[in-house]
Amino acid sequence: MKRSLHLFLLLVALCSVVAACGNSSSSSATSTPSSIKLNIFAAASLTESFTQIATAYHQSHPDVTITNNFNGSQLLEQQIANGAPADVFASADMANMMKASNAGLVGDAKVFVKNRLVVIIPVGNPGQIMSLKDLARKGVKIDLEADTVPAGHYSRQALMNMSQSPDYGANFGSSVLANVVSQEENVKAVVQKVQLGEVDAGFVYRTDVTAAVASKLTILDIPDPFNVIAQYPIAVVKSSANAAAAQSFVDYVLSMAGEGILAKYHFIAVNP
């Protein structure tokens, strides 16, 4: 009888220990912080640089998972206005950021980098374009972003600037625009068509000529007096469910680490 009682008590004790361990394990699991998710809405021209920035930021903030949404700034602004779950907005122009700001969609914006336009032609040069003046030659096929796209707006400004110069002539801009055979929603679409040889030339940012496509393209620089320098602002979206983490990401972009990554992709520093 005593032996049976001892075995019973021992069994109860073992069950208590197992239960305690189970509770401890459960408590530990529930105390583990869940991953923070950030949705970054960034201009298409930031694709390569922000992909690397997101990776670098995650390495120092392993609890934060970043999803990038790259597209034309005008489309991103519309998506945010329509309620898309964005935490950070990085635009390729001030106009779309101001539109978002005036609608109360974003917080204070800061310019974090600049960019410049170039003309790209495919290797092999099917259009026989030797200089910018050749863009006005009848029959040349040019791809350009739509006027609502920052790069498209800047390109038209540059053409207007060149038309003011006797080196190009008053009709230069209109002649170039008459050769436009397609208008795209973002710069990456222009790069794609040019590198495939579907058109003879296209207007993009210098940063769009990345290592992945450089061997398939030739760059024609637009002289500084006529070029348009794009300013890129960044801001936290007010509806963000993770505003503190979103601000931390913005701060990283503005930091020396972020500037260093952007410089690798030929962006122009705000204060060079």
Positions of PLM-derived features:
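Exported/periplasmic ABC-transporter solute-binding proteins
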Residues: 21-60, 65, 74, 78-82, ...
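Residue-level signal for mature regions of secreted extracellular proteins and peptides
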Residues: 14-15
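Periplasmic-binding protein-like
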Residues: 87-91
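Central helical "cap/lid" subdomain
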Residues: 104-110
